Design a protein with these regions (language model features):
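Mature soluble binding/inhibitory domains
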Residues: 21-201
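Bacterial N-terminal signal peptides that target proteins for export
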Residues: 1-8
Length: 201
């Protein structure tokens, strides 16, 4: 497998001058992790935040959204896997994102697939453990709404102006893929603070 993202967190920088209350700053790695709605357990998002990657004070926010298509009770599962990305700003606890979908692939095999924009949304956090993903799809589904998010994996490094995070090395965490089957891959979260490893494929 080839690695497309490597990040090492050496320190957590607090932007207390521009952050209000306990809302977290989106230009920090600490929001990276697994998030879900307990009422809809079995689906959720894997979030990656790369601080200052776009420019000083501007992060790359990207994620994978594991969910399902609408189906009658008892019908066959119809999984849906979307990806999204946007640019987080220092001093802001929300970020607009574009939602993408890859279609036409095969399990762990060719062909390579390309992402197609199918909607937009806003990812917002009230604190280091709770957030909301609002979405509007522009494809034929016409779906619109929002889903609450609760942190699934333990918080280690997320910081606000009232609650600093701790340092941790997440060097192996990130997105991994095989170039021959680009359009699919795994998200790896290695959390040294909680001595846990989570992999989504």
């Amino acid at each position: 497998m080839s690695r497309i993202r490597i990040h090492v967190v050496a320190s957590i920088i607090l932007f207390s001058a521009s952050v209000h209350g306990a809302s977290p700053d989106l230009n920090q790695h600490g929001l990276t992790g697994s998030w879900y709605d307990p009422a809809k357990s079995g689906q959720g998002i894997e979030l990656e935040v790369f601080p200052d990657l776009i420019a000083p004070g501007t992060s790359l926010v990207q994620g994978a959204w594991f969910t399902f298509d609408s189906a009658p009770v008892g019908a066959s599962d119809r999984e849906r896997w979307y990806t999204f990305n946007g640019n987080g700003q220092s001093g802001s606890a929300s970020v607009p994102v574009t939602i993408y979908q890859n279609v036409g692939g095969n399990f762990d095999a060719l062909p390579i697939t390309q992402p197609t924009a199918v909607g937009s949304g806003t990812l917002a956090f009230s604190d280091c453990s709770n957030g909301t993903l609002s979405y509007t799809f522009t494809d034929s589904s016409g779906r619109t709404g929002s889903t609450p998010l609760t942190r699934l994996t333990p918080n280690v490094t997320c910081a606000t102006d009232t609650a600093p995070g701790t340092d941790a090395d997440f060097a192996l965490s990130g997105n991994w893929f095989a170039p021959a089957t680009s359009g699919q891959g795994v998200v790896l979260e290695l959390n040294p603070g909680s001595q846990s490893l989570l992999l989504t494929w």
